[in-house]
C-alpha cells in the first residue's frame, strides 16, 4: 500500500517551495512599496491570501503564532455587531499575522465571542484527528527550527506529534533528493501544524 502520509508531506513541501519562490520574487519589486495592501492584492487574478482559524482563546493562539513561531501582527481589531440569533451585541476580535510576505501565507485568528469567556464556544471539545479528511494542515518552512522548537514545544496548549527529524523525498524530475527536517504538532485549538526546515548542505 502506498505511503499516503509520506506522499502528502511531499506535496506540502512542494507547495511550500513554490510559496517561498513566489514570496522572494514579489517582495523584491520596488514598485510595490507605493501601493496599499488592497491595491497589491488586486494585482493578481487569483490569490490564496489568507487562512483564517476560528479559535477559542486568541491570546493562547498568539503565544504560539506570534511569540513562538515569530509571525508578525499586521492587523488587530475588535468588531461589534448585533448577534445573529441572540438579543445582545456580539464582539469579535480579528487578527492577521504575516510570515515573510504580506500577501502569501498570512494567518488569520478570529474569536467570535471575544469578551464572553463563559460562552460555550470557548469550551468546545478540541479535535485532534491527525491526517484524516476534513482536517487542514498548516505547513511552515523556517531556517530556525532548532532555535524555535523548544519554545514551541513548551507553549501551553501545544501537543507534540513528532519532534524534528530528517526525512528524504525524491527530487524534482529525477534531480537530487530533497532532505527536510520535519516537526509536527497541534496548536491550542487542535489545528495540525508542520514546521519544517529544508536541509541545504
Question: What are the language-model segments listed below?
Answer:
Residues 56-59, 103, 112-189:
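Vicinal oxygen chelate
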Residues 43, 53-104, 200:
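Core segments of cupin and vicinal oxygen chelate
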Residues 25-51:
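N-terminal low-complexity, Pro/Thr/Ser-rich intrinsically disordered segments
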Residues 21-23:
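Boundary at the C-terminal end of the N-terminal hydrophobic targeting segment
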Residues 7-18:
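Bacterial N-terminal signal peptides
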Amino acid at each position: 500500500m502506498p505511503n499516503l502520509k509520506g506522499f502528502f508531506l511531499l506535496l506540502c513541501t512542494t507547495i511550500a517551495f513554490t510559496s517561498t519562490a513566489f514570496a522572494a520574487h514579489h517582495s523584491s519589486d520596488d514598485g510595490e512599496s507605493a501601493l496599499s495592501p488592497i491595491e497589491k492584492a488586486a494585482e493578481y487574478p487569483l490569490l490564496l491570501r489568507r487562512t483564517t482559524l476560528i479559535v477559542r482563546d486568541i491570546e493562547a493562539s498568539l503565544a504560539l503564532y506570534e511569540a513562538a513561531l515569530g509571525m508578525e501582527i499586521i492587523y488587530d481589531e475588535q468588531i461589534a455587531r448585533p448577534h445573529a440569533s441572540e438579543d445582545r451585541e456580539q464582539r469579535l476580535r480579528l487578527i492577521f499575522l504575516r510570515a515573510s510576505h504580506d500577501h502569501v501565507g498570512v494567518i488569520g485568528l478570529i474569536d467570535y465571542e471575544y469578551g464572553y469567556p463563559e460562552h460555550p464556544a470557548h469550551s468546545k471539545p478540541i479535535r485532534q484527528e491527525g491526517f484524516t479528511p476534513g482536517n487542514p494542515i498548516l505547513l511552515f518552512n523556517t531556517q530556525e527550527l532548532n532555535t524555535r522548537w523548544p519554545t514551541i514545544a513548551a507553549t501551553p496548549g501545544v501537543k507534540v506529534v513528532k519532534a524534528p527529524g530528517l526525512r528524504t523525498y525524491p527530487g524534482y524530475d529525477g534531480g537530487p533528493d530533497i532532505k527536510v527536517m520535519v516537526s509536527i504538532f497541534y496548536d491550542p485549538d487542535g489545528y495540525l501544524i508542520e514546521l519544517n526546515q529544508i536541509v541545504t548542505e
